[in-house]
Curated annotation (Swiss-Prot):
The keyword Mitochondrion applies. Keywords: Heme biosynthesis, Ion transport, Iron, Iron storage, Iron transport, Mitochondrion, Oxidoreductase, Transit peptide, Transport. It catalyses: 4 Fe(2+) + O2 + 4 H(+) = 4 Fe(3+) + 2 H2O. This is Frataxin, mitochondrial. One of its GO terms (cellular component) is chloroplast. It comes from Arabidopsis thaliana. One of its GO terms (biological process) is response to oxidative stress.
Length: 187
């Protein structure tokens, strides 16, 4: 058995707080002396070297780690989300179709199917917009700004990307004008 594997077997029971009986019942054979020999040096390390006990590390609550989960259904009811998202996507479809008549872009094509809006701008790239019902968001993939997730903001009456505070319509207007050379009014 490799040295690293033996080291892990000696240290693992202490970190997992497993008794030798429990380990044997799971098919792992470890002698009590081996466990005791590995525990004593670790106890000294945790008490003296770091002033932190091992049990404080293994019983730490992970609820404080990372962002809190959001119950999106409480933010926007599903029926209201679909109504707002469908209206927005259909509105964008109509406006961008009209815009396509005014710009000379090889490969310009807009398609809406399976609740996904796809705008192809030939060699300039492709936009994809779709609903994410569980999150109550509209997701956009842009050849300019990359992926964005827009939440409905009741106060602003707009879809907002929380990371940058960008509004969906405004962001699309700016990017399409820069890419295609013609202004567009989406709002």
């Amino acid at each position: 058995m490799a040295t690293a594997s033996r080291f892990l077997l000696r240290k693992l029971p202490r970190f997992l707080k497993l008794s030798p009986t429990l380990l044997r019942s799971n098919g792992v054979r470890v002698s009590s002396n081996l466990i005791q020999d590995s525990i004593e040096p670790l106890d000294s390390f945790w008490r003296i070297g770091s002033r932190i006990r091992h049990d404080s590390l293994t019983t730490r609550s992970f609820s404080s780690q990372g962002p809190a989960s959001v119950d999106y259904s409480s933010v926007l009811q599903e029926e209201e989300f679909h109504k707002l998202a469908n209206f927005t996507i259909n509105h964008l479809l109509e406006k961008i179709e009209d815009y396509g008549d005014n710009v000379q872009i090889d490969g310009f094509d807009i398609d809406y199917g399976n609740e996904v809006l796809t705008l192809k701008l030939g060699s300039l790239g492709t936009y994809v917009l779709n609903k994410q019902t569980p999150n109550r968001q509209i997701w956009m993939s842009s050849p300019v700004s990359g992926p964005s997730r827009f939440d409905w903001d009741r106060d602003a009456n707009a879809w907002i990307y929380r990371r940058t505070e960008a509004k969906l319509h405004k962001l699309l207007e700016e990017e399409l004008e820069n890419l295609c050379g013609e202004p567009i009014q989406l709002s």
